[in-house]
From Swiss-Prot:
This is Protein kinase 2. Residues 52-65, 79-96 have a biased composition (Low complexity). It comes from Dictyostelium discoideum (Social amoeba). It comes from the Eukaryota. The modification Phosphothreonine is found at residues 309, 470. One of its GO terms (biological process) is pseudopodium assembly. It is found in: Cytoplasm; Cell membrane. It is a lipid-anchor. Residues 408-479 form the AGC-kinase C-terminal domain. Residues 102-115 have a biased composition (Polar residues). Residues 153-407 form the Protein kinase domain. The keyword Transferase applies. GO terms for molecular function: ATP binding; cAMP-dependent protein kinase activity; protein serine kinase activity; protein serine/threonine kinase activity. InterPro entries: AGC-kinase_C, Kinase-like_dom_sf, Pkinase_C, Prot_kinase_dom, Protein_kinase_ATP_BS, Ser/Thr_kinase_AS, STKc_AGC.
């Protein structure tokens, strides 16, 4: 489930067309080229073009009204900001109708638009469907008496919508605790063959605990829906703030980057690759600290060969993903480099409105770093955006990223305790404030709508697909 920006797993360049030439930072800023290694082999131009054309056709028909409104406001204000970013993954092409639904997303509090698929990766290599062919997933059954049901929560506001359902701000009855409840339709998940992705997201979230990763508190189900109760984080998407401000100062980016590095390092130590790092999937809490959400594309790496699924968001795809090579946690460090560049300049480093051109730039393009970026930050970007996986910064573990000179003043223990001073604090009045969430969603009446009986046949017939989905966090059991 996503955000007010397009989140179609098989479509779009990820950025709507802009009027005039896209800007990176201030128009008068000079750039200095920095060479990066050229990978071999590369995908054929024909396959890249085919994949890009499919995505561009999807994007032209699926840009949400809210995204268009945001883009028009950006153009009127002459702000150089990134636009809609579109994840892609290879497991079944969504129809135009499904794609349109995907544009009605708001990535709030871990709301993921679970991976759909596309029939062709750029070079046609890899099975592209590793998450669906692995056989039954081990499920963990809840053995406590404190499992929740939907009747335990009061619905307050709609804070996001997607192709599989919606996300609502809720209050636990009899308590003052506020959560975000993600509601997913089983029939939609089964129809799009996303059962394993959905179960994997829940399993990963219940196994991790980190100050900069959204927490899962409850998971339960009815005969037609799945429910995940997560932290309610109300400081707004990083995307929202970046769009409004154009780019961030380097000291501000450094704190965000350090918190992301800490979270990625934690995931990688458990052999979990995130695979969808981008501004839309990063929320700010009320104090200005980051919170990574949406684990719909995350995967636990079980073999040394890595995974071959062609998935992610075009602007942030690592070269090895485009090449169809097996990939692992190193793809997250490439995406981090892309994200840092975007926060510092306003656009991703290899961005193009033409997807095929963008893919070729990712594979072979020159990395141009503006002169206003410090030498230490430039060095970090060059290390993270190294095309040769074995030479990429972070490949040997998050520790080598933490030891980079740009982070020399970061006290990592204080950082994880959220004791490091942030440079921006969102304007929210309380923990229940929804002012940073798109009113397109918050104006909708909160209700858990019924699923038509005719749509339930397949889902009800496969109800065992979600066996073991129930979960209650240890922190709840200790209360």
């Amino acid at each position: 489930m996503g955000k007010g920006q397009s989140k179609i797993k098989n479509g779009g360049s990820g950025k709507p067309a802009k009027a005039g030439k896209p800007k990176k930072g201030n128009k008068n800023d000079e750039t200095t080229p920095t060479s990066t290694p050229t990978p071999t082999p590369t995908p054929t131009q024909q396959n890249l073009d085919n994949s890009a054309q499919q995505q561009q056709q999807q994007q032209q028909t699926t840009t949400a009204a809210v995204s268009l409104d945001n883009k028009e406001q950006q153009q009127q204000q002459n702000i150089p900001a990134p636009a809609t970013q579109t994840p892609i993954t290879q497991t079944g092409t969504p129809t135009i109708e499904e794609s349109q639904k995907n544009t009605d997303n708001n990535n709030i509090n871990g709301a993921s638009n679970e991976a759909s698929s596309s029939p062709d990766s750029p070079n046609g290599s890899g099975n592209g469907n590793d998450d669906e062919d692995e056989g039954p997933e081990e499920v963990i059954f809840s053995k406590n008496k404190q499992s929740a049901t939907k009747d335990d929560f009061e619905l307050l506001n709609v804070i996001g919508k997607g192709s599989f359902g919606k996300v609502m701000q809720v209050k636990k009855k009899g308590e003052d605790k506020i959560f975000a409840m993600k509601v997913l339709r089983k029939d939609a998940i089964i129809a799009r063959k996303q059962v394993n992705h959905t179960k994997s997201e829940k399993t990963i979230l219940q196994c991790i605990s980190h100050p900069f990763i959204v927490n899962l508190h409850y998971a339960f189900q009815t005969k037609d829906k799945l429910y995940m109760v997560l932290d309610f984080v109300n400081g707004g998407e990083l995307f929202f703030h970046l769009k409004r401000e154009g780019r961030f100062s380097e000291p501000r980016v450094k704190i965000y980057a350090a918190e992301i590095v800490s979270a990625l390092d934690h995931l990688h130590k458990q052999d979990i690759v995130y695979r969808d790092l981008k501004p839309e999937n990063i929320l700010l809490d009320s104090e200005g600290h980051i919170c990574i959400t949406d684990f719909g594309l995350s995967k636990k790496i079980e073999t040394t060969d890595g995974t071959f699924t062609f998935c992610g968001t075009p602007e942030y795809l690592a070269p090895e993903v485009l090449n169809g090579h097996g990939h692992g946690c190193a793809v997250d460090w490439w995406s981090l480099g892309t994200l840092l560049y975007e926060m510092l300049t306003g656009l991703p480093p290899f961005y193009s409105q033409n997807v095929s051109t963008m893919y070729q730039k990712i594979l072979n393009g020159e990395l141009k770093i503006p002169t206003y970026i410090s030498p230490e930050a430039k060095s970090l970007l060059e290390g993270l955006l190294t095309r040769e996986v074995d030479k990429r910064l972070g490949t040997k573990g998050g520790g080598e990223v933490k030891q980079h000179p740009w982070f020399k003043n970061i006290d990592w223990e204080k950082l994880d305790r959220k004791e490091v001073e942030v440079h921006f604090k969102p304007k929210v009045k309380s923990g229940t404030d929804i002012s940073q969430i798109d009113p397109v969603f918050t104006q909708e009446r909160p209700m858990d709508s019924l699923v038509e009986t005719s749509a339930l046949g397949d889902a009800m017939g496969k109800d065992t697909s979600f066996e073991g989905f129930t979960y209650v966090a240890d922190s709840i059991l200790k209360d």
